[in-house]
Amino acid sequence: MKIGILSQFPELYSTRRLVAACESRGHEAVVINTLNCYMNINSIKPSIHYQGQELTGFDAIIPRIHASVTFYGCAVVRQFEMMGVFAANDSISIARSRDKLRALQLLSRKGIGMPITGFANKPNDIPDLINMVGGAPLVIKLLEGTQGIGVVLAETKTAAESVIEAFLGLKANIMLQEYIKESNGSDIRCFVVGDKVVASMKRQGPEGDFRSNLHLGGCGEKVKITPKERKMAVAAVKAMGLVVAGVDILRSNRGPLILEVNSAPGIEGIEQTTGISVTEPIVEYIEKMVLAQKSNRPVIA
């Protein structure tokens, strides 16, 4: 097969590992910078061009769309879909998961546990919003933030009001979430492919920081997840319509809570922490789906 890897960063560990996984299974892997693609949108033969040439002959793509280019990246993925190319994560699912508020609403609809979350537009709604999520301490998040950036822990009601007013004054979209103190600055990252959790790790934030993101200096360690956590992770991915995703879970006194579903999860941290390849299952899943697509038969993922 000919598999395109949509990534702005060919030198990244994640990109290199995906290329290696494709090639080790006998496939041709082509890294395509998403932002350098341009599209011919028509009703007869939609196409994508890249560096002056039309992209043809692709059986599948693996989107690694950076959050900062979600709109254009989803347009490129959608164009590949219109050309009949299988996408490991389709454009609609990526867009769903990137809209943090919409993602939480979808999880809520499916009855999947998550931290109590509040969202408002007007400053005079702030006091009631704070009470709604259980009062201080509480977490304030920018909807557009990624990798722990734009996430603030407000220890008191006064601090929360000040931060919220400042964000709203900048016309920023924010949401409030209850603070799960018992998680102690840690979470569980589950790497899901299809209907399986192929690897999982516990992430612990640096001392004094409640955020567990590895990009912010957190560390990872192997962890054994419970059957309930495994089931919740897969259910959360399905709620988004994704195939490949990272699911972040908080362990709380009332059970596991889904924090986020990431459509382009980091690969380096979880592979180096667990010693498990997460890229091979991705390619294996693509093989199964493309074969089924070509033979026009249903697949049991």
From Swiss-Prot:
Its EC number is 6.3.2.-. Keywords: ATP-binding, Ligase, Magnesium, Manganese, Metal-binding, Nucleotide-binding, Protein biosynthesis. Mn(2+) 2 binds at residues 260, 262. Mg(2+) 1 binds at residues 248, 260. The keyword Protein transport does not apply. InterPro entries: ATP-grasp, ATP-grasp_RimK-type, ATP_grasp_subdomain_1, RimK, Rimk_N, Rp_bS6_RimK/Lys_biosynth_LsyX. One of its GO terms (cellular component) is cytoplasm. Belongs to the RimK family. This is Probable alpha-L-glutamate ligase 1. The gene is rimK1.
